Amino acid sequence: MKIVKVVYTTTVPYAAQNQVNIQNVMSDLQRSDRPGINYSVCLCADGKTFMHLAFFRSDDDQKILNELPSFKHFQEQLKANGFEIPPVQELLTLAGTSKAIFKEQE
């Protein structure tokens, strides 16, 4: 399993569009129902800092997300609109969970 956390801060004017783009990615992931991808995004209290947390069963699952047209669009738009604070990526190790992360484990 691979766990990726990414945190960045957008400009205030772009934050709402970023949320729309994120929702488009989530809708596509929900439709595709990929069991090896568990992906969440939270918006911090400042209304412009986003924290992405992605759990991938395999590198192939991560590749599926990275090649998703809506995800590519999200990334392109985010880069084009600039950051107040650029993305910081961190690989995490799971210490514990209250529920199964992937559907087949339920």
Listing of model-derived features with the role each one plays in the protein:
Residues 1-69, 81-106:
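Short S/T/G/P-rich N-terminal loop/turn motif that feeds into the first structured element of a domain
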Residues 73-76:
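Mid-chain, well-packed structural core segment of small domains
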